[in-house]
């Protein structure tokens, strides 16, 4: 079979055309595309591309015999360095640069509609992606146009998510999901877009209408190497072909650089808390929160900007959640929701699973489960709960660890943050993966001035139980790092584990209602 030639300079559409023509001529209608042999069904098309960036490599072509044995109707294979076996029992089409075409190919194969029928909103940043995407979906769904979610908690509508195991699914699965969501009634999708996903091309083929940037703090340096490379990966979303609007956190230095680099024609909204008024810089659209007041049941803040002024009463706590809500507000406005309507929806947002999720607090200590797993996120979480702890007349506990096989540089930083902001620190396992759990705890403790003040309990369930059992009735306990996760990975094996469930059990053991 002659390979379909491509050129680095040829438009994607021109490169796709012969591949689509070949598929339509040789593959039955309704066949699925997949690059995962575990998901193959009889009649499917196996897409055997090669990942060749400097940080991830993979080659699907050695799995072609397995795919053929599974009964695929055809195979698309990366052409470079590949010769179709003369006795191949299935149709195989070699394609140059197949990995770059996988997303756009799937988008056309599954007939994913454009922004007029399916508005896709991309949310990127170190922290806040899940909360913002969930809140965007909650708010837009109140308009009558159902909004789905793709992200860390899963894919689907907010009340019926299906776990995928990835923040951003692979390019083919993502386009298949977008088409399925549209057929199920979605008219918008709020999608978490990770730096890994952007760099590995998982979002390729997606027609983003609006992009939201939350923040950039240290994380994933085990993958990206430097903060500059990490920022560059995030920035790809804001140079996306066809992007109409960008909502950007101006409080973050990386946000300022994104705003400065936006191409002409992209409508921008910048937002922040206090600080210099965007109007003084001649910014077009802007939002600013001032006079932030924390109380035991949430936060109240004033918001003003180019759209109007108002006071917002939110059930969420923490300055970081004020920032996240400003970002969501900017997205709603760019999606055409009127100012007063957008504000009303903002006040009706509900907390997200594993994000500042509260348990107890009435007849026992208040326990908060949060996904904070970076230095900045842990600091923001502890700072957010400090005034609540003070109002209760108690002390603040931090129960956390750090993930194995991930950026080790953040471990001592998180130890130092916990020692500085919490009165009690319990170090425990997060997802140690292939690393020795005790070595991870020791690295966290290395960042503390007096590590003897921290209690080390490797078993996470026992650590949670210890904190709940020994906390005063007025205390606040933060169980940080895993949030919504339902498993814990130790020595390469995942086992069922839920922070929420173990918090409930610990409170019950103390005789306290969760």
From Swiss-Prot:
Pathway: Cell wall biogenesis; peptidoglycan biosynthesis. It is found in: Cytoplasm. Meso-2,6-diaminopimelate binds at residues 406, 430-433, 481, 485. Keywords: ATP-binding, Cell cycle, Cell division, Cell shape, Cell wall biogenesis/degradation, Cytoplasm, Ligase, Magnesium, Nucleotide-binding, Peptidoglycan synthesis. InterPro entries: Mur-like_cat_sf, Mur_ligase_C, Mur_ligase_C_dom_sf, Mur_ligase_cen, MurE/MurF_N, UDP-N-AcMur-Glu-dNH2Pim_ligase. It catalyses: UDP-N-acetyl-alpha-D-muramoyl-L-alanyl-D-glutamate + meso-2,6-diaminopimelate + ATP = UDP-N-acetyl-alpha-D-muramoyl-L-alanyl-gamma-D-glutamyl-meso-2,6-diaminopimelate + ADP + phosphate + H(+). Gene3D superfamilies: Mur ligase, C-terminal domain, Mur-like, catalytic domain, MurE/MurF, N-terminal domain. GO terms for molecular function: ATP binding; magnesium ion binding; UDP-N-acetylmuramoylalanyl-D-glutamate-2,6-diaminopimelate ligase activity. Its cofactor is Mg(2+). ATP binds at residues 125-131. Its main location: cytoplasm. It comes from the Bacteria. GO terms for biological process: cell division; cell wall organization; peptidoglycan biosynthetic process; regulation of cell shape. A motif (Meso-diaminopimelate recognition motif) lies at residues 430-433. UDP-N-acetyl-alpha-D-muramoyl-L-alanyl-D-glutamate binds at residues 37, 167-168, 194, 200, 202. Carboxylation is probably crucial for Mg(2+) binding and, consequently, for the gamma-phosphate positioning of ATP. Its EC number is 6.3.2.13. PANTHER family: MUR LIGASE FAMILY MEMBER, UDP-N-ACETYLMURAMOYL-L-ALANYL-D-GLUTAMATE--2,6-DIAMINOPIMELATE LIGASE MURE HOMOLOG, CHLOROPLASTIC. Belongs to the MurCDEF family. MurE subfamily. This is UDP-N-acetylmuramoyl-L-alanyl-D-glutamate--2,6-diaminopimelate ligase. The lineage of its organism: Bacteria, Pseudomonadati, Pseudomonadota, Betaproteobacteria, Burkholderiales. The gene is murE.
